[in-house]
């Protein structure tokens, strides 16, 4: 679960977020560009630190904790797949910062790759992949971290509608299987509404609407 009440002194627009998200809830985060959607996710993940207030994740205070210490995994629009590495190596970075995996870690990589539909690509270099395949690799790496809170910041916006729908269905299945708490920034809410059970709308650094679906 997520519970926060924080301020963030952004240069052009001071922000104040108050939000509670139950365990396993799937929340869409919508709003105009620059409204503060990504900042909200960055505060939860620890990439931005709150000016004041508190962030509780699964009832533990992580307000000023390091990114790596938080029970959160996050995927951005830019997939950050390393082109010179294989798919297996890219996914394995979720487990170890080096390129040598133990047999047990290799099995974990194969399992998540199978769930993402990219098992046959494990030995292929990332620079030989399509955009949709790269995003599947990035999503697999994110999910392999096995954190209870999943944050997605417009991860599929660069893909065509068919590829977006495929990956959104994968996210829905994984979230249900693992009972993950999901916050996802999206500009294609009408296409992805079935993925969520709640939507929040952000304007000028504040949540101005909150609706169950």
From Swiss-Prot:
It is found in: Cell inner membrane. GO terms for cellular component: plasma membrane. ATP binds at residues 31-38. Residues 1-212 form the ABC transporter domain. Its EC number is 7.6.2.15. The keyword Nucleotide-binding applies. Keywords: ATP-binding, Cell inner membrane, Cell membrane, Membrane, Nucleotide-binding, Translocase, Transport. One of its GO terms (molecular function) is ABC-type thiamine transporter activity. It holds the Pfam family ABC_tran. Gene3D superfamilies: P-loop containing nucleotide triphosphate hydrolases. The keyword GTP-binding does not apply. Its main location: membrane. It catalyses: thiamine(out) + ATP + H2O = thiamine(in) + ADP + phosphate + H(+). It is a peripheral membrane protein. Belongs to the ABC transporter superfamily. Thiamine importer (TC 3.A.1.19.1) family. PANTHER family: SPERMIDINE/PUTRESCINE IMPORT ATP-BINDING PROTEIN POTA, THIAMINE IMPORT ATP-BINDING PROTEIN THIQ. The complex is composed of two ATP-binding proteins (ThiQ), two transmembrane proteins (ThiP) and a solute-binding protein (ThiB). Part of the ABC transporter complex ThiBPQ involved in thiamine import. Responsible for energy coupling to the transport system. This is Thiamine import ATP-binding protein ThiQ.
């Amino acid at each position: 679960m997520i519970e926060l009440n924080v301020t963030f002194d952004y240069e052009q627009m001071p922000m104040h977020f108050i939000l509670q998200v139950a365990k396993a809830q799937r929340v869409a985060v919508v709003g105009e560009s620059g409204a503060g959607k990504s900042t909200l996710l960055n505060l939860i993940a620890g990439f931005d630190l709150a000016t004041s207030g508190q962030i509780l994740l699964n009832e533990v205070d992580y307000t000023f904790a390091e990114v790596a210490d938080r029970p959160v995994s996050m995927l951005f629009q830019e997939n950050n797949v390393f082109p010179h590495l294989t798919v297996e190596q890219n996914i394995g970075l979720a487990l170890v910062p080096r390129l040598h995996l133990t047999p047990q870690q290799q099995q974990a990589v194969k399992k998540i790759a199978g769930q993402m539909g990219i098992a046959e690509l494990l030995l292929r270099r990332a620079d030989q992949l399509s955009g949709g395949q790269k995003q599947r690799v990035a999503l697999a790496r994110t999910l392999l971290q096995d954190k209870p809170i999943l944050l997605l910041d417009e991860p599929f916006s660069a893909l065509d509608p068919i590829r977006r729908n495929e990956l959104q269905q994968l996210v829905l299945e994984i979230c249900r299987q693992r009972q993950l708490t999901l916050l996802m920034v999206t500009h294609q809410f009408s296409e992805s509404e079935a993925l969520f059970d709640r939507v929040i709308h952000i304007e000028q650094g504040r949540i101005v609407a909150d609706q169950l679906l």
